[in-house]
């Protein structure tokens, strides 16, 4: 996935996000360990608005080519998708279809909840309350945020601490989703789980899933990822998105 303007790849992992946020320069090794840690450092130095402004510029203002996996999702249109990326490609995949959007938020005093709820009517988003959710619509869950329709992100260490605390307390998942997610199985694609933040978020979001929680596609998984998959009940498949799409294409042709 690259910028339509200059061909630069979209920042899609921790290292590339840190480099983009810091003007292409690496940060100290302890800060390069994980994006939230680096984001916290720059937030303390440059103010709380710095990181959201960077993410807006990166994911709202720059237009990118489409990824193959999102083209497949646009064709398949599953009823429930969790996307921990902060770009808008998943939302673009559902741009011609009504859906519910759940966006994670953090460090707010106006509400005890750590999410915003929107309904998309085929043209635009409008904010709704939990009791107004139409449960038969597809559900897009963006726990780490999105610039659309309103910029909200979980990015720095402080964001993650607040969000995960409320996630564990039940305040980051809408009530209707707590019911909807029961006994589900998940397919984890393009999601490294070698950092504590992502593991904690996914562990709680997939709570109440089927005993066989699903499938975790990861080439060259770390020992931590193997233990995580085994502990939660994910079947580990040593493959990546490209392998997955090639297998789908092979079956389609057959």
Label each region the model flagged.
Residues 1-254:
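SIR2/sirtuin NAD+-dependent deacylase catalytic core
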